[in-house]
Amino acid sequence: MGLDDYVIACRSYKWANVFPHKTYRMLAHNALTDRLYIFVANQEEKHLYEHALHGLPYKQIIVGEKGGANATRAICHFFPVGQRILFVDDDLARFFTFSEKGEYTKDAKNLRRYIEDGFETIDKYNLGAFTFSFLSNKFYLQGKPFKEFRPFMLAGNFFGARNNPAMITTKLSHNDDAVRSVRYFEHYGGVLVYWWGGFETHYGQEEGGLQASGSRGSAAETLHKTKAASNEIYETDPLIQAYAKPPQQEKTNPFVTIKFKTLPQIRKAQKERGAPVRHARWSKWWNTKPTEAEL
């Protein structure tokens, strides 16, 4: 396996019986299971997943560590630096897309083409990482190009990048998406986002899965723990201070999270810090050259 042969690394926890019907099914639907490495928390979990996936194709099941951040660290340590890795979580039920004509496909089968295009594009233009917008409402997608390089949240449950532990691993699981994203803002200027596609997930709606690997207890305990974690990150990470707002509680649940500043504020911070201010848009589907570019 060469560094340019991408692998798919999935973090999963206590979902041996459900996993075959979630991310595994989605990958099988897209003929991608031959690249799949599954990272579980312990040896007992490994046996359960082997039993649940008996007779089904996959590359390997590896005992990593419990917890989102720890599992990501185990993935980065398992593969060589520079390896093309697609990081996925265990709750990706379906891959959906829109065609250039706006036709919606709920359970698409062309994820491989996006992955290959993503790795080729970030390597060709030195863009660092790619993800999807996860937006399925056309109203919010009006005027968006096929793909775009800009500051954007690098979703922890699906992103592709060359293995670089210093960029990818985080101390804490909470807000790891934001911590990882701002590193790419600082080093590359943003991330590559495919606007017209994403994944159906049921995060927080079902028992088990990777989400359960960092259970925070009751609503009051969750509020306390996420507030403490968010404050620690904000107070100790200068990149978070530069590109994100102070921690705030979510309106609809007992979570304290970190959200990014507005795009103009992020661009201003990049200029002040001497970070690259880069942008590109690919308006047409599958064009190899950007329609607009400041790279």
Regions found by a protein language model. Name each.
Residues 2-7, 14-22, 172-174, 178-295:
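C-terminal catalytic/acceptor-binding lobe
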Residues 4-10, 33-39, 58-61, 85, ...:
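Hydrophobic beta-strand segments of well-ordered beta-sheets in folded domains
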Residues 7-34, 44-53:
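Short, well-formed alpha-helical segments that are part of the catalytic scaffolds
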Residues 13-15, 67-68, 91-93, 135-139, ...:
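Short, solvent-exposed loop/turn segments at secondary-structure junctions
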Residues 20-26, 103-120, 222-231:
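Well-ordered, non-membrane alpha-helical segments in soluble/globular domains
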Residues 39-88, 93-107:
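Active-site-proximal specificity loops/subdomain of glycosyltransferases
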Residues 84-89, 128-133, 191-195, 242-245:
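A structural signal for short, well-ordered beta-strand segments and their strand-loop junctions
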Residues 95-186:
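Conserved catalytic core of nucleotide-sugar-dependent glycosyltransferases
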